[in-house]
Curated annotation (Swiss-Prot):
Transmembrane segments: 50-70, 83-103, 127-147, 158-178, 185-205, 233-253, 276-296, 333-353, 368-390, 397-417, 435-455, 473-493
Annotated Polar residues bias: 1-26, 536-550
Disulphide connectivity of cysteines: none
Coiled coil spans: none
Designated gene of the protein: NRAMP3
Lineage per the UniProt record: Eukaryota, Viridiplantae, Streptophyta, Embryophyta, Tracheophyta
Keyword tRNA-binding annotated: no
A GO cellular component entry from the record: plasma membrane
GO molecular function, one term: cadmium ion transmembrane transporter activity
Name of the molecule in the record: Metal transporter Nramp3
Origin species: Oryza sativa subsp. japonica (Rice)
Keyword set includes Cytoplasm: no
Length: 550
């Protein structure tokens, strides 16, 4: 529908034509885009509408089966068998709830998480949150760099450090995507990742893990042995990534959702269903990888070569786990799937970086320049580590990158929980008490396990580093001061009151009445115009509308 909106009992749509006719204010699109293939949600109630919402959840779920997840899953299974499966279960459930909140924030307010942060926090706080978000994007890109380098090593015997340099060429691939569209490559990626997932599931049948041990690992929390806590944190960081919250809240802005209470609730429900389906697939893939790794490496019939691989398992050695299914082709096919996984994650990481920069700083870069910047920052540590320590050290860098993501998660999660629990931002679409308790419990658990690991690891480092007493004292002072700053920053975000009202726009109104107030309050900074042209103008994979299925 185009033209001026009129009051009606029917749900109202806000078209891009109307948006372009507005004055250049906060709601003006960053890109004067023109012909954008919009995804329009029909007004009629139908389960076919679900097909119109499919897309964002699957793009986000790519991060749950990236090389970082492969690496942490393989090491978790090889070192602790099925002991850490419960982390995957909890992380997957937490991810579903948290990602659904991110989608809801975008649908209800018409603004994504980074934009809300810019509107809500002082300049200094906003700048720090932007730096942390950018570091999260870079930390997420490190596994993609190393995973791609490992894949090139398996395919062409290229040294890992050379492969790290070659990964910069993925920028050229992104350029091609911008020119020819994403659909065909995403379809190819889906086939390759599905193929490797199928192989692990079939291998699961060959390896025959002890079902009672698997069930125990899923439902009985345990953290035994040295390094279990650190690996659990890396698993958590690999599953619930801070950049995904920014990404998901922005991707949903590409849909033309009915601006009515019912239309918004339906959109939130369908986005949750789509996310649940996508994350269930990712959950099964992660569970199968850990179980295969645990069953194979825990076997008593391993050859000396396989025993050596299991003792220092990383992505570069993991193909032997698939020999029962693929034989001599295991290495090549695993490398191709690893390459596909790394490149697909690079694409979503690039978009996440764009949304972060646009939201926090009101700046926008050409995608290939944005990709080149992020990739350059990720290549530097990967190159140094791969040259000095080889593939084993590069694999450990993936674990460290995942741990960094876990430590940074509260700085994206707390603002999300605060915003979605705020009636002045979400109106009647705020989180229920049950959801609030669950999500704040998840956030508290993450902070507690991160703090516990920091303290125990730092104390061990102080006691066994061989430094003089004076050096230990000063190291302890600075180390614990850093931990106090970390905790204080989180507490600041938790207890700071929201000060900006960003309300949903309903039924064509420019103002929304807050429950319990006598006057209409203008939704400050609320865009309310979906689809957002600065979002939908990006050449993301487009889905058929529900009307196309009739």
């Amino acid at each position: 529908m185009s033209g001026p909106m009129q009051r009606s009992s029917q749900p109202q749509f806000i078209s891009s034509v109307e948006r372009n006719n507005q004055s250049n204010g906060p709601g003006t699109p960053l890109i004067d885009s023109i012909d954008v293939d919009q995804i329009v949600i029909p007004e009629k109630n139908s389960w076919k509408n679900l097909f119109s919402y499919i897309g964002p959840g699957f793009l986000v779920s790519i991060a749950y089966i990236d090389p970082g997840n492969f690496e942490t899953d393989l090491q978790a299974g090889a070192q602790y068998k099925y002991e850490l499966l419960w982390i995957i279960l909890i992380a997957s459930c937490a991810a579903l709830i948290i990602q659904s909140l991110a989608a809801r924030l975008g649908v209800v307010t018409g603004k994504h998480l980074a934009e809300h942060c810019r509107a809500e926090y002082p300049k200094a706080t906003n700048f720090i949150l932007w730096i942390l978000a950018e570091l999260a994007v870079v930390a997420c890109d490190i596994p993609e760099v190393i995973g791609t380098a490992f894949a090139l090593n398996m395919l062409f015997k290229i040294p890992v450090w050379c492969g790290v340099l070659i990964t910069g060429l993925s920028t050229l691939m992104l350029l091609l995507l911008q020119q020819y569209g994403v659909r065909k490559l995403e379809f190819l990626i889906a086939i390759l990742v599905s193929l490797i997932a199928t192989c692990f599931l079939v291998e699961l049948g060959y390896s025959k893990p002890n079902s009672s041990e698997v069930v125990r690992g899923l439902f009985v929390p345990e953290l035994k042995g040295n390094g279990a806590t650190g690996l659990a944190i890396s698993l958590l960081g690999a599953m619930v990534m801070p950049h995904n919250l920014f990404l998901h809240s922005a991707l949903v802005l590409s849909r033309k959702v009915p601006r009515s209470v019912h239309g918004i609730k339906e959109a939130c429900r369908f986005y949750m269903i789509e996310s649940a389906f996508a994350l269930t697939i990712a959950f099964l893939i992660n569970i199968s990888i850990i179980s295969v790794s645990g069953a194979v490496c825990g076997s008593d019939n391993l050859s000396p070569e396989d025993q050596m691989n299991c003792s220092d398992l990383d992505l570069n050695k993991a193909s032997f786990l698939l020999k029962n299914v693929l034989g001599n082709w295991s290495s090549k096919l695993f490398a191709v799937a690893l390459l596909a996984s790394g490149q697909s994650s690079t694409i979503t990481g690039t978009y996440a970086g764009q949304y972060v920069m646009q939201g926090f700083l009101d700046l926008r870069m050409t995608p290939w320049i944005r990709n080149l910047l992020t990739r350059s920052l990720a290549i530097l540590p990967s190159l140094i580590v791969s040259i000095i320590g080889g593939s084993s050290a590069a694999g450990q860098l993936i674990i460290i990158a995942s741990m960094i993501l876990s430590f940074e998660l509260p700085f994206a999660l707390v603002p999300l929980l605060k915003f979605t629990s705020s009636r002045t931002k979400m109106g009647q679409h705020t989180n229920s008490k049950a959801i609030s308790v669950i999500t704040w419990g998840i956030g508290s658990f993450i902070v507690v396990i991160n703090t516990y690991f920091l303290i125990t690891s730092f104390v061990k480092l102080l006691l066994h580093n061989g430094l003089s007493t004076v050096s230990q004292v000063f190291s302890g002072i600075f180390g614990f001061l850093g931990m106090l700053i970390y905790m204080a920053a989180i507490l600041y975000l938790v207890f700071r009151k929201n000060r900006k009202a960003t309300l949903p726009l309903l039924e064509g109104d420019s103002t929304v009445r807050i429950v319990g107030r006598d006057t209409a309050t203008e939704g400050e900074g609320s865009l309310g115009h979906l689809p957002r042209e600065d979002i939908s103008s990006m050449q993301l994979p487009q889905q058929r509308t529900a009307s196309d299925l009739d």
